[in-house]
Amino acid sequence: MEEDAKREWRDIRLSTIGSQDYEDIYSGRRRTALENLAHRYKRFAIIGLLFVIWAPLTFYNPEIQIDNRLTIIIFSSIYFLTCGLMDLWLYRGIRSIDCASMTIKEVATRALFYRKRHLQFIAILLPFAFIWIGILCYNLCDNTAFLWGVGLGALAGFAIGIRQLMKFLNDYRSITED
């Protein structure tokens, strides 16, 4: 009788889960919101740090004057290094949240702390991104194709950034709600 009750309870619980969710849960591919945040921060940190290597390689452009080229390389390297290190710090902070040993209040408090830092980092880095784009456009204002590329790249980056920010905020919301 007890086994029948357990089986019926499990069937009721699983009937509310979609088939894809059911497969994800039992295959181990399903991640928590904390794991999603950590994974996303790690990916952004790696991308930011890779762009530090990319910056000097791609700005070897003969159209830019030598002294301006060095300024662009230094500014972009510092910018991407800062982005990567900030994301790495957020990644390590999110990974340090342990739901098994912390109370719900501690988990929520730390998640809100890192959410606040994330938004502060955006507020710091966004003006520098606009300055970086402005420096590039100023130095290559004669090259129409480059200006179109910068404009379209900025629009695409803005759209992707907003989408990723919404994913970050949704994960933070799912951690701190209730």
What are the residue ranges of the model-derived segments?
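Short, charged cytosolic
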Residues: 1-25, 92-95, 99
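Selected alpha-helical membrane-embedding segments in polytopic membrane proteins
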Residues: 18-20, 24-88
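Short membrane-interface loop/juxtamembrane segments of multi-pass integral membrane proteins
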Residues: 27, 100-118
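Select subsegments of transmembrane alpha-helices in polytopic membrane proteins
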Residues: 40-50, 116-128, 162
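Membrane-water interface of transmembrane alpha-helices
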Residues: 84-101, 168-169
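Alpha-helical transmembrane segments and their membrane-interface junctions
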Residues: 123-149
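Small-residue-rich transmembrane alpha-helices that serve as helix-helix interface/gating elements
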Residues: 147-160
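Short, highly charged, low-complexity non-transmembrane loops/tails of multi-pass membrane proteins
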Residues: 173-178
